């Protein structure tokens, strides 16, 4: 019985430390140092939450930039069903999905003469990716500009403004946050695209 007391005391101490003190401390420090990130990186426009800077949204109208396909099953970009498709590169079903996406993208972007960017045809590992490469965003500029009746140069400038570059090249590649970019397009014109 005497041998159980130190084990029980240690267990109780570690339970309080890892189950109480540590979570409360990290939550408090996160709220203090990084309040925007700790609260989900929510994007507010007109006192309404429009989305998160970390989770993509399904944009299908011609006047919006389209993000990567979502791998979430029934509802695109459903964070509760996050995950990849788990289809191997050699799987014929994945090939059929990619071919269908390429055909749909070609039909929606007849002005684009170059190859369809890979990230517009394949889902990310989470299925919720909100970022595209600047090249994939640039590929869509003619369609978005035509749908919104804006000069191509103005839309290209907006893409350049919303291109986030890493602090150093070895820390990643430049990305365009599609949610932020589409909200900026709406703000530019004062309405939502159809």
Swiss-Prot record:
Membrane topology, as annotated, equals: Single-pass membrane protein
**Major location category of this protein:** membrane
Entry's InterPro entries?
A: KdpC
Tell me the first and last residues of the signal peptide.
Answer: none
Q: Name one GO molecular function term.
A: ATP binding
Q: Which UniProt keywords apply?
A: ATP-binding, Cell inner membrane, Cell membrane, Ion transport, Membrane, Nucleotide-binding, Potassium, Potassium transport, Transmembrane, Transmembrane helix, Transport
**Which GO CC annotations does the UniProt entry carry?**
plasma membrane
Q: Does the keyword Cytoplasm apply?
A: no
| Pfam families, A to Z | KdpC (PF02669)
Compartment(s): Cell inner membrane
Q: What sections of the protein cross the membrane?
A: 12-34
Similarity section: Belongs to the KdpC family.
| Complex formation | The system is composed of three essential subunits: KdpA, KdpB and KdpC.
Function per UniProt: Part of the high-affinity ATP-driven potassium transport (or Kdp) system, which catalyzes the hydrolysis of ATP coupled with the electrogenic transport of potassium into the cytoplasm. This subunit acts as a catalytic chaperone that increases the ATP-binding affinity of the ATP-hydrolyzing subunit KdpB by the formation of a transient KdpB/KdpC/ATP ternary complex.
Annotated protein name in UniProt: Potassium-transporting ATPase KdpC subunit
Q: Which organism is it from?
A: Salmonella choleraesuis (strain SC-B67)
């Amino acid at each position: 019985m005497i041998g159980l007391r130190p084990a029980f005391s240690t267990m109780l101490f570690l339970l309080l430390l890892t189950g109480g003190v540590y979570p409360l401390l990290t939550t408090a420090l996160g709220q203090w140092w990084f309040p925007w990130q700790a609260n989900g990186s929510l994007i507010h426009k007109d006192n309404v939450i429009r989305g998160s800077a970390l989770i993509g949204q399904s944009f299908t109208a011609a006047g919006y930039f389209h993000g990567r396909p979502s791998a979430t099953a029934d509802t695109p970009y459903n964070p509760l069903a996050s995950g990849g498709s788990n289809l191997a590169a050699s799987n014929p079903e994945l090939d059929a999905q990619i071919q269908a996406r390429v055909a749909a993208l070609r039909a929606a972007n007849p002005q684009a003469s170059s190859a369809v960017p890979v990230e517009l045809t394949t889902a990310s590992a989470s299925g919720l990716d909100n970022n595209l490469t600047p090249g994939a965003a640039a590929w869509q500029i003619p369609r978005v500009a035509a749908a919104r009746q804006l000069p191509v140069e103005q839309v290209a400038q907006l893409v350049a403004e919303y291109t986030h570059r890493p602090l150093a090249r070895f820390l990643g590649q430049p990305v365009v946050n599609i949610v932020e970019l589409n909200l900026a397009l709406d703000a530019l014109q004062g309405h939502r695209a159809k």
